[in-house]
């Protein structure tokens, strides 16, 4: 009888929870809409032409639903800002608070920028791309709200499975190989994280990280055993933010996956992953300062030193994201208000900087392909118009000339950027601004992003006098100086090298507009960084 009376209350709570998840409902609607179109029209040859037209409109459909989600999220931000009332959903599996809605806004914003990237570069993607992308976005949004270990695991797996598919969406040998590596490393990280979570559940008797029983249970267990369980658990978070030692998949995936997808990978999982890490670090009583400091130093050092030897722009940016994850981990080392505020500021700056960097790299692709095809004999240049699968059937030519897949593996080599800044000064200036922001040089927002992180670290060191913090501070400064050598490599080729033979490079008005939209905040946030820091302080 009690269970029967309790059932209406459970249903009421479920309905209230669904109402609070309106952005996710909108995204799920767009997901189902795209799936239904694909299922209905894919096998109908008479509708083949209609299918092609609908696919070309797919990004616009998703764009519309993302804009609706942004409107709803902005309304939720306003409500949370004035009410400041955390709303627990689905029996404390999720929480809707100001942090969650702000981070969801950043994720959906990055999705909109991804769709804009695809639109202005006229990327031709398969129909399955858009529903898979939306499923990944839904998983990321759930990650931002997850406060239950089971929900954290499920949302991370939703993101991971979607990421694996998006990596191999091109169906080339290179993307398949990198996708397989991604799956293997992801499965390993997932297994380790799940084992750590099971240990924590055994120690505490609860999966709710906001429950007092969770912290109390960990504190009553031997510190070595609890620390091992915690470290195993955070391995999954490190995998999603591309931090050492779970970064090995990053360079290959970034090199082979479509550039718009890589741009999204470089920031969206980090946004969700760092919020999950912040919630988890706040819940555990153990002092993880030393462990996190070592992870930060490893990520920064490995990312920067590996980038020094890279000759491919996308691989260079991949190692750059590893290093930036290390810098953001410094905020978790401090676990101070300034440190956590600095992490959010860093994420926002990185959103615009990384999206701009990959967009500008992608803009140069037609110039590279044009040069290669113009310099090939006619029988070979015609082969470039074929897909890799069709090209492989012509074995006599395949052995002697590059296919599109082979060109893709070499077209983003940094020497291929030679002289593009001379051919298009606007492009060169935009790329220069983005690169010096990644390096942390004024007058860009990247300077204040690193300055805030180092300020928080120095403040924590003065309060605790922990030697590991001083070493982390020194390592961070030295690596920032080292990073100048590879971040300025592309601008050097843009302006100080002669253009390649028969090369032309022009952008259209839409490409100029999107580049300005992404680069302008990088400059504005240098002069008005206090505006954003003041807003973030309310989180």
Specify the residue positions occupied by each region the protein language model found.
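Alpha-helical transmembrane segments of multi-pass membrane proteins predominantly involved
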Residues: 1-539
């Amino acid at each position: 009888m009690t269970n029967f009376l309790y059932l209406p209350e459970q249903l009421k709570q479920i309905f209230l929870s669904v109402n609070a998840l309106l952005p996710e409902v909108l995204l799920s609607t767009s997901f189902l809409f795209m799936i239904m179109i694909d299922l209905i029209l894919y096998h109908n040859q008479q509708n083949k032409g209609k299918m092609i037209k609908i696919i070309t409109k797919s990004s616009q459909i998703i764009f519309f639903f993302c804009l609706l989600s942004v409107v709803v999220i902005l309304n939720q931000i306003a409500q949370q800002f004035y009410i400041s009332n955390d709303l627990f959903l689905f029996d404390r599996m999720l929480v809707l608070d100001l942090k969650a809605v702000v981070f969801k806004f950043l994720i959906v914003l990055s999705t909109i920028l991804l769709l804009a990237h695809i639109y202005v570069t006229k990327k031709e993607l398969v129909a399955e791309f858009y529903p898979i992308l939306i499923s990944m976005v839904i998983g990321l949004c759930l990650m931002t709200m997850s406060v239950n270990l089971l929900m954290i695991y499920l949302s991370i797996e939703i993101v991971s499975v979607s990421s694996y598919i998006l990596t191999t969406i091109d169906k080339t040998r290179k993307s398949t190989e990198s996708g397989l590596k991604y799956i293997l490393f992801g499965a390993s990280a997932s297994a380790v994280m799940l084992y750590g979570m099971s240990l924590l559940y055994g120690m505490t008797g609860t999966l709710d990280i906001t429950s007092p029983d969770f912290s109390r249970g960990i504190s009553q267990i031997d510190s070595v055993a609890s620390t091992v369980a915690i470290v195993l658990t955070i391995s999954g978070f490190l995998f999603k933010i591309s931090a050492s030692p779970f970064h090995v998949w990053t360079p290959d995936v970034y090199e082979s996956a479509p550039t718009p997808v890589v741009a999204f990978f470089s920031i969206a999982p980090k946004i969700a992953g760092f919020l999950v890490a912040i919630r988890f670090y706040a819940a555990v009583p153990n002092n993880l300062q030393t462990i996190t400091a070592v992870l930060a130093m490893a990520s920064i050092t490995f990312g920067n030193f590996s980038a020094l030897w890279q000759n491919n722009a996308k691989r260079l940016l991949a190692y750059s994201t590893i290093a930036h994850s290390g810098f953001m981990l410094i905020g978790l080392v401090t676990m101070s208000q300034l440190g956590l505020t600095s992490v959010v500021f860093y994420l926002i700056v990185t959103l615009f900087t990384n999206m701009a960097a990959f967009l500008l790299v992608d803009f140069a692709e037609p110039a590279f392909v044009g040069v290669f095809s113009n310099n090939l004999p006619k029988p070979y240049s015609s082969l470039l118009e074929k897909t890799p699968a069709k090209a492989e059937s012509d074995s006599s030519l395949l052995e002697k000339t590059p296919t599109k897949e082979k060109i893709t593996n070499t077209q983003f080599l940094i020497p291929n950027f030679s002289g593009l800044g001379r051919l298009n000064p606007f492009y060169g200036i935009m790329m220069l601004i983005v690169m010096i922001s990644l390096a942390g040089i004024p007058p860009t927002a990247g300077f204040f992003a690193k300055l805030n992180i180092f300020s928080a670290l120095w403040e924590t060191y003065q309060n605790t006098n922990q030697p590991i913090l001083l070493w982390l501070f020194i390592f961070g400064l030295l690596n920032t100086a080292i990073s100048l050598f590879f971040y300025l490599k592309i601008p050097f080729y843009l302006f100080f090298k002669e253009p390649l033979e028969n090369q032309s490079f022009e952008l259209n008005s839409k490409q100029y507009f999107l580049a300005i939209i992404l680069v302008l905040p990088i400059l504005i946030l240098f002069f008005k960084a206090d505006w954003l820091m003041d807003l973030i302080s309310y989180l």
